[in-house]
């Protein structure tokens, strides 16, 4: 019961900050969206700059980007819904979010996850001085302990948000650059990687720049896997927060 109470407190605090409003998008022209990405002037410059900075092959990067498909739904999802004058505001308040994040199913999953991973959680506390309840709360809020890590193709997400969602293009271009480096260094096929519509991946829903910066091989198997390894996920979150 103590762990359940601590978990409720941890998730409540995290979920309260999760409802940040996302800025409205500014769409590119239809003509641009119908064109292969590598032929668009803005993308050509991006390719040149990234390859110069990171030592990647321009033809390889262009070929990867041309496999991406513009996703209009992602633009819609990134745009907050605002109530029209005279209509009811349907945005969720804390009470509605509380029912989502503190339901019995999620809490039971959290308690079991804590039991199953207690060794790694205590190691994270010792090494990074991060309370296990905070780590548990983050994984619960982000992916429901791995039940929903996202089904969007991350390449589609990041390319759409870099070149067709102008309001936050600079941020997503940096994430796309890091994603391309991850693909190149790990010999991954672009559509093998799935995640959220914003391009976050794995149990902790890290953006590519965070993966590079804080990833931790916490189970000592020589690999860092935040998609399947709860140990690596715990270590990486703790490293991120330390």
Residue ranges of predicted features:
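Short, flexible active-site loop motifs that bind/organize anionic cofactors or intermediates
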Residues: 13, 33, 51, 125, ...
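Catalytic glycan-binding domains that act on GlcNAc-containing polysaccharides
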Residues: 58-242
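C-terminal segment of N-terminal export signals and the immediately downstream linker at the start
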Residues: 1, 18-48
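N-terminal mature-domain "stem" immediately C-terminal to a signal peptide or N-terminal signal-anchor/transmembrane
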Residues: 34-69
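N-terminal secretory signal peptides and thylakoid transit peptides that target proteins
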Residues: 1-13
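A generic secondary-structure boundary signal that marks alpha-helix termini
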Residues: 15-19, 147
């Amino acid at each position: 019961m103590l762990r359940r109470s601590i978990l409720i407190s941890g998730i409540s605090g995290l979920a309260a900050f999760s409802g940040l409003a996302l800025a409205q998008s500014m769409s590119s022209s239809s003509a641009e969206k119908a064109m292969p990405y590598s032929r668009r002037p803005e993308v050509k410059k991006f390719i040149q700059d990234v390859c110069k900075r990171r030592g990647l092959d321009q033809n390889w990067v262009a070929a990867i980007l041309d496999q991406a498909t513009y996703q209009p739904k992602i633009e819609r999802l990134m745009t907050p819904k605002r109530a029209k004058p005279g209509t009811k505001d349907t945005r969720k308040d804390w009470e509605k979010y509380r029912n989502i994040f503190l339901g019995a199913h999620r809490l039971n999953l959290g308690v079991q996850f804590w039991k199953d991973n207690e060794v790694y959680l205590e190691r994270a506390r010792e090494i990074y001085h991060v309370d296990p309840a905070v780590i548990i709360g983050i994984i619960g809020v982000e992916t429901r302990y791995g039940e929903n890590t996202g089904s969007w193709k991350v390449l589609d997400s990041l390319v759409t948000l870099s070149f067709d969602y102008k309001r936050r293009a600079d941020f997503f271009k940096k994430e796309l650059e890091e994603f391309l480096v991850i693909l190149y260094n790990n010999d991954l096929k672009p559509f093998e990687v799935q995640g959220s519509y914003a391009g976050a991946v794995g149990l902790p829903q890290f953006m590519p720049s965070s993966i590079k910066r804080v990833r931790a091989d916490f189970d000592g198997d020589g690999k860092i896997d935040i998609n399947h390894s709860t140990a690596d996920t715990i270590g990486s979150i703790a490293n991120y927060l330390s």
